[in-house]
Design a protein with these regions (language model features):
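Generic multipass alpha-helical transmembrane bundles of integral membrane proteins
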Residues: 35-157
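C-terminal transmembrane helix-loop-helix hairpin of multi-pass membrane proteins
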Residues: 111-117, 124-214
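N-terminal topogenic module of multi-pass integral membrane proteins
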Residues: 1-80, 178-214
């Protein structure tokens, strides 16, 4: 299967799995655990099917780093604390980062896939900003995170993007924590500005990753 097919299959599987988690009404910790597992399984799938790639020791090391990054991403996006827009904001930023790295390194197919994933999550974000309406469900988080994990894995295995730059993108999932050092107050304006500040911090991280990759 092509990378596009793999990502589409994994994204759909993550979405369905997340929907199952949502419908079954798992309590907080089991729910988090299952959401965290989904993107990690997606990355394992990509690595297991990577026989067409010639993996060096450095590549294997970076795959381990990406695996750890995916674990961190799952932990950070499955939390119940904070704004309901936190997880979609981080996932949109991650998709944007993968788009930039793919594009500047000439992997336009993965860039397009990253853009589609980002715009899909961005639609949910736009519907919930500046007025928050609906919390992100497990289907959205698991589906998007699984797709992005697959993109990150394929990007590293393809060899056109340095593993270091992709690993740096993992810091995006701490953007909300870094943005927390700036306070806009607890009113409606403050709540509306927080996701934008998270995106601004994430954009800085993407810029660093792009510089390293160039």
């Amino acid at each position: 299967a092509s990378p596009f097919d793999q990502i589409a299959i994994l994204g759909f599987a993550g979405f369905v799995f997340g929907g199952f988690v949502e419908l079954e009404g798992f309590h907080h910790w089991p729910r988090r655990g299952l959401i965290i597992v989904a993107p990690m399984v997606g990355l394992i799938w990509v690595i297991a099917r990577a026989g067409e790639f010639d993996l060096t020791i450095a590549d294997r090391n970076f795959v381990v780093f990406i695996f750890v990054g995916v674990l961190i991403a799952g932990v950070r996006t499955s939390r119940g604390k904070g704004s309901g827009l936190t997880a979609p904001t981080l996932l949109v930023a991650a998709a944007g980062g993968l788009f930039v790295l793919s594009w500047i390194n000439g992997n336009f197919d993965l860039a397009k896939i990253s853009a589609v994933i980002g715009m899909s999550i961005g639609g949910f974000f736009a519907w919930n900003w500046p007025t928050y309406r609906y919390p992100p469900g497990a289907a959205l988080v698991a589906g998007a995170a699984t797709s992005l994990a697959a993109v990150a894995g394929i990007l590293v295995l393809d060899g056109r993007v340095s593993g270091t730059s992709v690993a740096i993108l993992g810091l995006i999932f701490f953007s909300d924590w870094l943005a927390g050092f700036v306070s806009f107050g607890g009113g409606q304006v403050g709540r509306a500005m927080r996701p934008l500040l998270v995106i601004a911090v994430a954009a800085g991280i993407v810029a660093v990753a792009a510089t390293v990759s160039a």
